[in-house]
């Protein structure tokens, strides 16, 4: 792992200053770099596929603010749209035409969605969707999957992923046992366990919520039939099927994972990309369900800045640019993501370092494994087989060469339409140096 050197000296000073006034020095736990050790890198600007830290070091960025920046940093069209709207007003607390325009575009892109409600974060989206599911069914139990992260609402911080996985916390202090008791967790990809649960308690279950790709415990793909099997179980037992596409939405395909794999959820949670880099979330779905949301119906949900015009125009511009008349740039990003993933796999084979690399659309993930032949398909396996110490050495070897990856192997990576073939070449060249270093350090 990297030690503090002149390369990161200002980040070290900034971190010390931040810890005096911010708990842990960061405003979201994974940013503290606990998953890789050392100090967090402080950034000051970004452009296209690149970010620069406060020490002036340039990096090819594969975090992209944890996914929202599909077009890369400071895309000219997005910057112009935000600037023009800011000059007109940043928030009105009243309806705008931008909300309707973005709603129509999302409905056009995602086949299952008939109506949508914008909120301010992915956490608000999942929390509201689950409240809606309980209102619609009159039931109380929620089913989620170990290692899947759906935000930090009390009922969802049970065997969660993301920062909770990085920090090794099974759940969070402050969550009342009575709240946690209404969330049942089972292993991701275990359809038999889900079927057994429904056979035993199906009449009590309001909803099943799942990430189509478990990208908050690394990068775990669904087994064939897993997601469609969950859809069938919920239909049979009258529960609501919620697909959390906060991360995969508009990242793996224009219509999300559900369009890619032919799924028809009752409700969908969105975020990240639909805000174009500004705070946003949304829950959406069938008209019959969404008509229960106030003021159309009795289920209350509100927000001072929900649907604010800055986020709406940033999201609208992002989606129009990515999936408008020419979606070639998005397809090129998909191709480059696959090339990066293939290159990492080949390096693992060449240097005899066991890795598990996955990719779909513009998302990817890379586990370093404790032993050859292991395969991670669930949270239990991720905890058992993932070699976090080796990943930490790899992370810093890449950072020292100007490649910024997620500071935890329990987080996914992302590409943007701004990443070039030359960026992939540079990244794989750096990765070869890093893999060679892992071999030499083990000898």
Swiss-Prot record:
UniProtKB keywords: Chlorophyll biosynthesis, Cytoplasm, Isomerase, Porphyrin biosynthesis, Pyridoxal phosphate
EC number: 5.4.3.8
Necessary cofactors: pyridoxal 5'-phosphate
Gene Ontology MF terms in the entry: glutamate-1-semialdehyde 2,1-aminomutase activity; pyridoxal phosphate binding; transaminase activity
GO cellular component: cytoplasm
Localisation per UniProt entry: Cytoplasm
One GO term of the biological process aspect: protoporphyrinogen IX biosynthetic process
Modification N6-(pyridoxal phosphate)lysine occurs at: 272
Pfam families according to UniProt: Aminotran_3 (PF00202)
Pathway(s) the chain acts in: Porphyrin-containing compound metabolism; protoporphyrin-IX biosynthesis; 5-aminolevulinate from L-glutamyl-tRNA(Glu): step 2/2; Porphyrin-containing compound metabolism; chlorophyll biosynthesis
Catalysis performed (reactions): (S)-4-amino-5-oxopentanoate = 5-aminolevulinate
CDD domains documented for this protein: OAT_like
Main localization of the protein described in the UniProt heading: cytoplasm
Gene3D superfamilies linked to this entry: Aspartate Aminotransferase, domain 1, Type I PLP-dependent aspartate aminotransferase-like (Major domain)
Homology family: Belongs to the class-III pyridoxal-phosphate-dependent aminotransferase family. HemL subfamily.
SUBUNIT field: Homodimer.
Protein name (record): Glutamate-1-semialdehyde 2,1-aminomutase
Naturally occurring in which organism (per UniProt): Chloroflexus aurantiacus (strain ATCC 29366 / DSM 635 / J-10-fl)
Gene name, Swiss-Prot/TrEMBL: hemL
